[in-house]
């Protein structure tokens, strides 16, 4: 297939996008500084800034003193040139965040989904509330990105099934697009957490890593060569079903209910899932209301609580070693409420135990993404899409 010729229009589009991305990363620059960073002549840089200013994408945000002569104008990206919405959907809560083109989340609201049995209504109402809180119109939102538990078909972008959200099934993507009237992306929640970790967390320098989500349920986000790996059907990362030593084999997986996978009766989920973590805490004398609370107690409870941390680390290491001998990610990030509560104390223990079980021991660290990593990943995915549209050229 012949390459697209370097027409003046195409070259302008490339230069414009390069300049906008540079301004987002570096902050405001003068015309001369922009030329130095991009290699553009002063005349070309001036023409570029005039174009972007006319499109409402950049503006003068200040000035900088130089040598002789007047101060030079500083140009920055107009943050309000596009807004996006990121959402996390769960059976007990729905959180919506509004961000501008910089990716900064301005407003975050959480609403009761009432079981999330009406996906379109739930999403629309949550975004409407967030938009009003942000002081923008619903129509100002350019892209929506939604994180859900369960499997998303990588070929269609639609939900295949969500065990915790039975109303979220095939066809929901079209329904959301018809209602919202804008591009909508649905992604597995753990995959979005991995995107956040790659962009602003512990994996910013890694092109190959795995994020192990530890909460009530278990999940895995895999990044290979800088890209999410979803598998043929979107089931990559369903590590709750991973057969591991020390857990009964999940004999019911071959008999799923219509539209959903069965409850996990064994495997890694039984060895290290949330219910097991709370049961282990009870055995060690602590009645924990959540898996995260159990691990927080183990971290802060002194010598009497350390056996729980050691026990959990040993169980997690079995899964980590199994993952690493297949994928060899180099880095494993422990995320979710258990990973965050355990911090580096749990991560270091898991690393030591995993190193004894596999020939390619990984580095194991705790997540460094603050607050809601799934929401952060959803916003980042939406911003990337919005930038691609807004920066591409005049509509």
Name these PLM-found stretches.
Residues 1-63, 67-140, 180, 247-395:
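ATP-binding/phosphotransfer module of carbohydrate and carboxylate kinases, centering on a glycine-rich
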Residues 87, 101, 143-262, 383-395:
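Phosphate-binding/catalytic loop of phosphoryl-transfer enzymes
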